[in-house]
């Protein structure tokens, strides 16, 4: 079976495995998918040919690839250059780092996986994001779909939990992302609309003093978005909707979306993939906000 919904624009998925293509279509992550193309052993069409084809479609916002091997490095470099020129980002899961994976690839599609350090260098040079798992791939494609590539490495994150902020600090460091410095005037303005016990920093532990104060929550978001960072995110985990009332969480997300959609660099992050319900993910996507499930 093939799962999914029609979309006016979305990402193109190119796979050397039909099952993996299907698996991506089964996602519970609200990823807008325009194409799923399975190539197998590339006897007729190569990954490079298919990238070139999808780059010609103006509805394609980003390209996600599962690859076991390539047919032409020269052609691969050429289509990567085209993607950069068109500002259509590419994310890839390239398997074959281990001996076991290399042997499996040989029996699966007959591909030679090649030296992975060479691919690492190539992807980095061409601005292609290498992912290790399908979860990483789908989450990154959501970000690419809504925002494209970040303009710099300066980010900011806010949320009601100091523990979440600490974990995100570690996660950001592994990705070579930096928490930008909040300007003094913005810091002073944030202090005016938050409880004296709240320490303004980046990442910003907002705590829950304003949890039921929608006006000050909205003011906090408006002030925080004045920071000139490439990405500004709110971290929030929803309880189980079957057992709990989520009206308070919905209200906070609505305030965040109201502010963030004007700036086109906002994301909503949940620490677990399960703690962001579908109606919230869809609302974010429809308003240009990236709903990111999980810290990586």
Where are these regions (language model features)?
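Catalytic-core regions of core metabolic enzymes
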Residues: 1-296
């Amino acid at each position: 079976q093939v799962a999914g919904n029609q979309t006016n624009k979305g990402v193109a998925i190119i796979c050397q495995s039909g099952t993996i293509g299907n698996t991506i279509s089964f996602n519970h992550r609200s990823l807008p998918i325009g194409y799923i193309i399975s190539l197998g052993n590339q006897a007729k069409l190569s990954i490079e040919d298919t990238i070139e084809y999808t780059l010609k479609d103006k509805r394609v916002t980003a390209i996600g690839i599962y690859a076991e091997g390539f047919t032409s490095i020269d052609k691969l470099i050429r289509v990567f250059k085209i993607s950069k020129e068109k500002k259509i980002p590419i994310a890839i899961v390239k398997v074959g780092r281990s001996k076991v994976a290399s042997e499996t690839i040989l029996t699966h599609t007959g591909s030679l996986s090649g030296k992975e350090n060479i691919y690492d260098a190539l992807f980095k040079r061409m601005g292609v994001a290498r992912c290790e798992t399908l979860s990483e791939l789908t989450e990154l494609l959501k970000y690419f779909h809504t925002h494209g590539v970040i303009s710099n490495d300066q980010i900011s994150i806010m949320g009601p939990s100091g523990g979440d902020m600490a974990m995100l600090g570690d996660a950001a460091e592994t990705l070579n992302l930096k928490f930008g410095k909040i300007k003094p005037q913005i810091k002073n303005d944030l202090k005016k609309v938050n409880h004296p016990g709240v320490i303004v920093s980046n990442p910003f532990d907002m705590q829950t003093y304003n949890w039921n104060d929608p006006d000050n929550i909205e003011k906090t978001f408006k002030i925080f978005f004045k920071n000139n960072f490439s990405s500004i995110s709110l971290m929030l985990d929803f309880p189980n909707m079957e057992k709990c009332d989520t009206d308070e969480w919905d209200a906070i997300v609505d305030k965040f979306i109201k502010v963030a959609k004007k700036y086109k660099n906002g994301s909503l992050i949940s620490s677990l993939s399960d703690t962001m319900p579908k109606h919230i993910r869809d609302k974010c996507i429809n308003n240009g906000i990236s709903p990111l499930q999980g810290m990586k």
